[in-house]
Amino acid sequence: MKAKHIIIIACAALFGATQANAQGQTLPILTANTDARTAAMGNASVAAEGMYLYNNPSAIFGVDKKFTADASASIYEKEEGIEGTFGLYTATVGYKFAKRHAAFAGFRYAGGLKLKGSNMLGEPTKEYKPYDWTIDFGYAYMIGKGFSAYATGNIIFSHLSKNANGGAFTVGASYQNNDMTIANKAANFMVDAKVAAIGPKLDYGNGYKASMPTHVAVGGALSVDMADKHQVGAALSTRYFFQPSESKVFIVGGGLEYTYNNMVSVRAGYEYGDHNLSHFTMGAGVKYRGLRINGAYMLKTIDAGSSYCTVGLGYDF
């Protein structure tokens, strides 16, 4: 089997596990939601707390903690005819300093699938294990009056049957108001916009290049203290992928969250996406002092889709 053909098959298997290869979309490690909390709310991850580096770095200015750490794992259902189970694993830390500044670092790994190679006669040869990983950095700056801006960068390593290295970056801005009221109830509001995964194509050799999944994302989140110990929240976000230019995809998701005593939360939502990317979402979480534990399940809406679950652990202080 020619190397170029092996690369294409490995690419399809790795990306197909997340259904992120809709109409040619690539490198799902740069676009998959790593946050279990917002995954349960229709994957409305643009304006969110927790997993700041990969959601919204500016959101850290809305909390009274200086240091944050998160880790998560997403496990996807097995693909028919492919060995192994696809997983996305993430760890990130962030630090707020000098009132207006915050810095972040993180790491992501995606892999777990096995592909059997064959020669021109159809005889089995070596086994291929495609995977991706990234090292990520971010910086956020509080401009003032609730406005802030941020930028993140990614060092990317991708292995299909050949290796490719590259980089990408994201720029965004947000507004948040933690002192507003709605019907005499204390409320928090946040809106965020960004252009993400900007960068050159990854070159795997043998004539195969993968475009970055460059996209625009806009979203907002609102939470209201309905009564003593009772809080209700809502989130909505949309993403439009315009790269590769021949593989445009539109995704919109939203969800609701109920929290009791600022400790126990239940969540539900729906995510609509072109080309079999839609999901019903649900989950729950527990928060005690600075510790956060969340879980989510994304249920595919059609057989051609892919269901998956995400669990996350975080700590702020």
Question: What residue ranges belong to the model's regions?
Answer:
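N-terminal secretory signal peptides that target proteins for export/translocation
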Residues: 1-2
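Sec-dependent N-terminal signal peptides
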Residues: 5-14
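Sec/Tat signal peptide C-region and signal peptidase I cleavage site
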Residues: 17-22
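Subset of outer-membrane beta-barrel
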Residues: 23-317
